[in-house]
């Protein structure tokens, strides 16, 4: 048995850009099993000047997303790295869309629940149309950086996930 066989696997609820298989496959360097699920008690917000959303607790919130099943510690670390320090990982209960079974999983929540940059509702289809190509380019650059930082900082990567089309980022 290898050391990776001994590590527990992780099931992670993802939303936003991580629902897109092309993004997940690039970041995790594989195609994990994805299961549709809903997270109650959270809202999916837009973030001013960003290509990606965040979630934060909300009494009446409901988020449709996916569970990435069986992730390794290394894959979970890749998700954490690309999200950065503005997010925190939490254990939440989701409901599987097909079976209505409840399941405890991990997800990534925006650390500052009072952030004034959170607004409205993030739209996956709009993101795919307007921003997916740029986000995949940014994720590719992130993976290159992760493999060989070459003196570059994480902040250089973060510039790629800024939404330069919005007036708020000007």
Swiss-Prot record:
Ranges where the record places region Disordered: 147-170
Superkingdom of source: Eukaryota
Sequence positions that bind substrate: 15-20
Keywords carried by this UniProt record: Acyltransferase, Transferase
Gene Ontology process terms (BP): response to bacterium
Residue numbers annotated as active site: 83 (proton acceptor)
Biased composition (Basic and acidic residues): 147-162
Signal peptide region: none
Coiled-coil blocks: none
Induction: Up-regulated early after infection with P.syringae carrying avrRpt2. Expressed constitutively.
InterPro entries, alphabetized: AIG2-like, AIG2-like_dom, GGCT-like, GGCT-like_sf
UniProt family annotation: Belongs to the gamma-glutamylcyclotransferase family.
Job of this protein: Putative gamma-glutamylcyclotransferase.
Stated name of the protein: Protein AIG2 A
Source species of the chain: Arabidopsis thaliana (Mouse-ear cress)
């Amino acid at each position: 048995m290898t050391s990776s066989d001994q590590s527990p696997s992780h099931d992670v609820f993802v939303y936003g850009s991580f629902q897109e298989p092309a993004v997940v496959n690039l970041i995790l360097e594989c195609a994990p099993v994805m299961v549709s699920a809903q997270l109650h008690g959270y809202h999916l917000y837009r973030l001013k000047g960003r290509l990606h959303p965040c979630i934060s607790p909300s009494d009446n919130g409901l988020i449709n997303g996916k569970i990435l099943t069986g992730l390794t510690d290394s894959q979970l670390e890749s998700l954490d790295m690309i999200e950065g320090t503005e997010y925190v990982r939490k254990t939440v209960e989701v409901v599987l869309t097909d079976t209505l079974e409840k399941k405890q999983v991990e997800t990534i929540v925006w650390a500052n629940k009072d952030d004034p940059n959170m607004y409205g509702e993030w739209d996956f289809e709009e993101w795919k149309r307007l921003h997916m190509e740029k986000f995949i380019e940014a994720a590719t650059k992130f993976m290159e950086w992760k493999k060989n930082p070459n003196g570059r900082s994480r902040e250089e990567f973060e510039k790629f996930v800024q939404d330069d089309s919005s007036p708020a980022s000007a």
